[in-house]
Each structure stands twice: as C-alpha cells, then as structure tokens.
Amino acid sequence: MIKISIDAMGGDFGPEVVIPGAAKAFERHPDIRFIFFGLPAQVEPVLARYPKLKEASEFRASEVAIGMDDKPSQALRAGRGKSSMWQAIEAVKTGDADACVSAGNTGALMAMSKFCLRMMSDVERPAIAGIWPTLRGESIVLDIGATIGADARQLVDYAVMGAGIARALFEVRKPTVGLLNVGTEEVKGLDEIKEAGQILRDTPLDGLEYSGFVEGNDIGKGTVDVVVTEGFTGNIALKTAEGTARQMAELLRQAMSRTLLAKIGYVFAKGAFDRLREKMDPNKVNGGVFLGLSGIVIKSHGGANAEGFCSAVEVGYDMVRNRLLEKIEADLAHFHHSHSHVSSKA
C-alpha cells in the first residue's frame, strides 16, 4: 500500500479537478490510499461523487486554502499548521503519507516544503525536476524554477538527483546527463558550468554517464536523458517551450481552417495531428518533483485537468514504489565521498 497526501484546494480548479484526478489514479493503482486535506464545504461534496475512492481514502479538514497568488512568506504566516498545503506536506514528515501532491502555488509549496521537511544531508539547494517530451521519448530537466543561480557543486548535485529520477521513471540503468550551456565546447560558458563539467568528468559515477555540454535545441531532441541547469534559465526554457507548443497549435489551426482544400487535408491527416497533440499535451507529462528534500513532494501544474493531476499522482506513486528517495540519498553520499577522494588525490 502506498499512501499519498493530497492538497485538495490546490490549483486553478481545486477539488473539482484534484479529486477526479485522484480517482483516475486510484482506478489504475488500487494499492494507493489517499489522505485529502481541504475545506469541508468544498471537498466533501465532490468526494461523495466517487464512493469507491471515498471508501479507500481519508479526509482531514483544513481551515485555510493557500491562494495561487499568495507570496511564499504570506502563505507561511497564514497557512502554517492549518492550511491544506501545509497539512499535506506535514503528513509526509510524520509518516502518515509516503508522498505529497499539490497543484497549488509553487513558491508557497516550495517554502513550506523546505520549512517542514528540511533538506537532505549535504544538499544545499532544492531543485524542481520536470518531465520533458522529446523526439526520442522523454527526458528530465532540472532545475525548472526552484532557485535562481547555482554553483558548480549544486549543479553536480542536480545531475546526480536527476539521474536517479531518470533511472526510476524511464528504467534506464545509466542515464546520460548534459549541462545546459551556450555551446558544446569545453571552453564556453560560465565558470560554474565549466567547473561542474570538470567535476563530472573527473569523478567516477556508477549511476550516470556524463555527456558534456548541451545546447537549448538539444532538450527537445532528446540528446540526453537528463538536462541540468539552474532555476532561472530552466524556468525560461520551460515557459518558452510551453509557449512555442501553444503557438504551433494555433498556427496549425489557422492554416487548416483557411481554405476548403486545407480543411479536406486536415480530415485525412487528423490521426497524425491527434498524435502530435497528445505528444505535446502538458497533462501527459505533468508532475514536477521537488528534489533535495527529506520527503517526496510533487507539484502538479496549476491549470492541469483531471488527467494531468492523475499523471502527477503517478509520478509520486512511481517514486515511492521505486524507493527513489533512499536511492538518491545513497547516490549523493557515494558521489560526495568519491569527489572528496578525487580532490584529495589531486
């Protein structure tokens, strides 16, 4: 049995999407047991529509719902101990739940997670890892917005943690890892990126294969399994990709509706367009993982539909099932030991 705590008030639509999404996950994985946190007047009527889910779940009342526009400091002051978001995270800390899933305010969720769960030993900064659709399948990109800036040591920690997720979600024994840079040549880029590359080249690692620097256009190609960057650049890359996908969809729609011949062509090509739309649908790869914390927290996109929220729950489910947290901690400890040994010999 895998226990997952849910911030039922999170996201643009709250319980109206969160609970149906959880119901979909329960249909696919009957060994999940949910603990829902939220305002009774809004959660209980929706939960009542899913009797099987309700019977296999627990509901705990909250006093406060964190708004999508609340500042992290404001959310901490108003929501600590009594908001659905805090209580869902705290359930992981107390051991009531194995993982937490929320579609709520990203800044507030990260602030509360850091405050409540604390960081892993020897990890200085958290990162958000996202699943990215590529020409070859999917890849992991991190950090996509947890913190701005990162030094070489932090970038290397991201590489180790990202490789751990790739092994669990993609079932790859030794994921390839690249550092996002302005060019693939070793002399290019900021000092911290070049230093991180040097560390990854010099330190023996069983759990990943360092492939050098990658450029922005390599992300969508699927050149590597894991792309590592700091949060400012990663978030811009994410928003650019999302905007480009929407732009392409709109341009295709306009082109296919412009003339009668185009409309006829669309009828014959509809299957291909449907497959493309499904490939680019953010709901199919929803679920950002907060890495570096001493517990599992999954961030669903705030505008996700029920299928999208279900995908986020499944990411948490897979992480627990694969004991990913313990493996990442072991990988980090092994890396830090190996790196210190290499550094002392140098």
UniProtKB/Swiss-Prot annotation:
GO CC terms of this entry: cytoplasm
Gene Ontology MF terms: phosphate:acyl-[acyl carrier protein] acyltransferase activity
Pfam families recorded: FA_synthesis (PF02504)
Domain of life: Bacteria
Keywords: Cytoplasm, Lipid biosynthesis, Lipid metabolism, Phospholipid biosynthesis, Phospholipid metabolism, Transferase
Main location as per UniProt: cytoplasm
Pathway: Lipid metabolism; phospholipid metabolism
Cellular location(s): Cytoplasm
GO biological process: fatty acid biosynthetic process; phospholipid biosynthetic process
Subunit organization: Homodimer. Probably interacts with PlsY.
Free-text function comment from the UniProt entry: Catalyzes the reversible formation of acyl-phosphate (acyl-PO(4)) from acyl-[acyl-carrier-protein] (acyl-ACP). This enzyme utilizes acyl-ACP as fatty acyl donor, but not acyl-CoA.
Name of the protein this chain belongs to: Phosphate acyltransferase
Lineage of producing organism: Bacteria, Pseudomonadati, Pseudomonadota, Alphaproteobacteria, Hyphomicrobiales
Gene designation per UniProt: plsX
